[in-house]
A protein has these predicted regions:
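Short, structured coil/loop segments at alpha-helix boundaries
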Residues: 4-8, 57, 75
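Short leucine-rich amphipathic alpha-helices used at interfaces
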Residues: 5, 41-42, 47-49, 54
Length: 75
């Protein structure tokens, strides 16, 4: 079964990924609950919201998140 809560270890892995884009960690918002389909988007306040996809295994989602984060950063 896929956990619906995002663990500290998973948050750490997401932040390691966002560090590759040299993003300030203060600009990253990661809700503690995963959501169906997940999402990665820039919020009106300039922060980037990263919602883990509850429907995918975490490693698979994280691999696909890299491209989406890049798209959001470049937008």
């Amino acid at each position: 079964p896929i956990p619906k809560d995002v663990t500290f270890a998973q948050i750490t892995r997401i932040l390691v990924l966002t560090d590759e884009f040299e993003l300030d960690r203060e600009l990253i918002e990661i809700p503690l609950a995963a959501s169906s389909h997940g999402k990665i988007r820039k919020l009106p306040n300039g922060k980037i919201e990263i919602v883990v996809d509850a429907d995918l295994p975490f490693d698979e989602w994280l691999a696909s998140a890299r491209q989406r984060i890049q798209q959001v950063v470049e937008a």
